[in-house]
Amino acid sequence: MGKNARQTSRLTAKSTLKPARNPREESLATTADVLGKKLVTFSEPTKTPEAGNARVISVVNQKGGVGKTTTAINLGAALAEVGRRVLLIDFDSQASMTTGLGIKGAALREQYGSIWYLLNDSEAKLEDFILKSTVPGLDFIRGHEDLAAAEAAFVSEIAKEHKLRKLLAPVLDKYDVILIDCSPSHGTLTVNALTASNGVIIPMECEYFAVLGLSLVKKTIQKIKENTNPELQILGILATMFERKTSHSREVLELIDKEFPDEVFDTIISRTVRFSESTVAGVPVTAYASSSSGSASYRRLARELIARGGAK
């Protein structure tokens, strides 16, 4: 059995962790019930007849700990549930997405088959190293800690900002959506991800200091549009880690919605222990705690993204 096959078999092993019963958690939140905006409903999307011409979406914020990885994994899983063929790319040296999908220990540290390996081996083909998650229709490429060296490794390369775009090109006709979990920086990796993408989702914690960094993210996106990818679009700002019981969360959400009224997703992601529990279990929250508010929120976000045209 080859290395790739061994990693896949480890991944698909069922977790023994189970969610606790009768969880006390936030209910599903939207801008309608939190801010009093008009309620928007999104119909269940029809399945696409065949994959192809994938929409590439970067999940970006230059601040860490705002829910990028949680969003990439669980939005991807929710899209797969409605028949979309989804590929996740772990583009962060912390490899949190890889861990959240069940790869741990020695397999996590192995460079061979990771996105870092693919970026550095011109003869390697991305399609040869795609791993299957426990969710049908949800595939992924592992991250690796050596991604932290990208800035120095690619400094002298010509057209270095196009490396990921070229790597993804052969698999665009095999998927409907490709989600890239970006590193919390505005360096070479993020530039590569944005250059390869059609759209951007910006998760933003409902905390005041997170608002201050939002303008920096938007400036980075504007620079990419001016220099390497004029078609790049902001698909939406996603409020995360919302706590209904605190006035601060509501005040921050009001501020974001006032500043960017056309860009804020109607769906809000509330804070819940289910997200951290599902990461430990190595599966998306939609599989770990299917009836939880976290699962419901990401399923609603998937419908909203499709309705907005961000995904087909």
Residues covered by each model-derived region:
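P-loop NTP-binding core
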Residues: 1-312
